[in-house]
Amino acid sequence: MRIILLGAPGAGKGTQAKIIEDKYNIAHISTGDMIRETIKSDSEIGKELKKVLDAGQLVSDEFIIKIVKDRISKDDCKNGFLLDGVPRTIIQAEELDKLGVNIDYIVEVDVKDNLLIERITGRRVHPASGRTYHTKFNPPKVEGKDDITGEDLITRTDDNEDTVRERLSVYHAQTSKLIDFYRNFSSTNTKTPKYIKIDGDQAVDKVSQDIFNQLK
């Protein structure tokens, strides 16, 4: 099973991706995680990527395809995989097709923008462990402190409202074209991904069940 998981920043893609990965025993390929690891390395390319993300822009198609191509060649992807964060553009989708990557399902987790903004701007992170909290939905026991270590929590630099609105604008502009691309795929290809739109405003387990009901 090969799945593309779509959803705006803050839609809960990461949570659903982990649940899908465990249920179907497929590899979860998160470009976001791979990009963050590159930034942590403090290399020159990592510094450039940080500037791009801080400005609310998307990483180049060339870089994304390069890291995805390398990742899907690994043995753990032979049983299938879930792409989280790619493709985001028509160019990326076309490049995946050129690589012979046949997709079975396109799953979009749809959440209203006002809720996404609330989710993201209230997010707080413990840098060392990656533990994530939320000022409203999942607050720490002590405000601004990690529950386990007591260390300070931070707000990611790209989690401010202006940057979030810019990211959402870019996401919507590109995703609508991407969905049209895959819908039109049927005119020239016998194997067409099934497009599934899921209401992401629901509880996590309800979102998961709705996805499972469609992945048959």
Swiss-Prot record:
Entry keyword annotation includes ATP-binding = yes
Q: In which pathway does it act?
A: Purine metabolism; AMP biosynthesis via salvage pathway; AMP from ADP: step 1/1
Reactions mediated catalytically: AMP + ATP = 2 ADP
So what family is this one in? Belongs to the adenylate kinase family.
PANTHER family from the xrefs?
Answer: NUCLEOTIDE KINASE
What the protein does comes down to: Catalyzes the reversible transfer of the terminal phosphate group between ATP and AMP. Plays an important role in cellular energy homeostasis and in adenine nucleotide metabolism.
Q: Which GO terms describe its biological process?
A: AMP salvage
Q: Can you tell me which residues the record assigns to a coiled coil?
A: none
Q: Which GO terms describe its molecular function?
A: adenylate kinase activity; ATP binding
Domain statement: Consists of three domains, a large central CORE domain and two small peripheral domains, NMPbind and LID, which undergo movements during catalysis. The LID domain closes over the site of phosphoryl transfer upon ATP binding. Assembling and dissambling the active center during each catalytic cycle provides an effective means to prevent ATP hydrolysis.
Keyword Nucleotide-binding among UniProt keywords: yes
In which compartments does the protein localize?
A: Cytoplasm
Q: What is this protein called?
A: Adenylate kinase
Q: Any idea which positions bind ATP?
A: G10, A11, G12, K13, G14, T15, R123, T132, Y133, Q202
SUPFAM superfamilies with a match to the protein in the record: P-loop containing nucleoside triphosphate hydrolases
Q: How does it assemble?
A: Monomer.
* InterPro entries registered for this protein in UniProt: Adenyl_kin_sub, Adenylat/UMP-CMP_kin, Adenylate_kinase_lid-dom, P-loop_NTPase
User: Which Enzyme Commission number(s) are on file for it?
Assistant: 2.7.4.3
What cellular component terms from Gene Ontology apply here?
Answer: cytoplasm
Query: By its UniProt entry, which Pfam families does this protein fall under?
Result: ADK, ADK_lid
Q: Cite the residue spans of the region called NMP.
A: 30-59
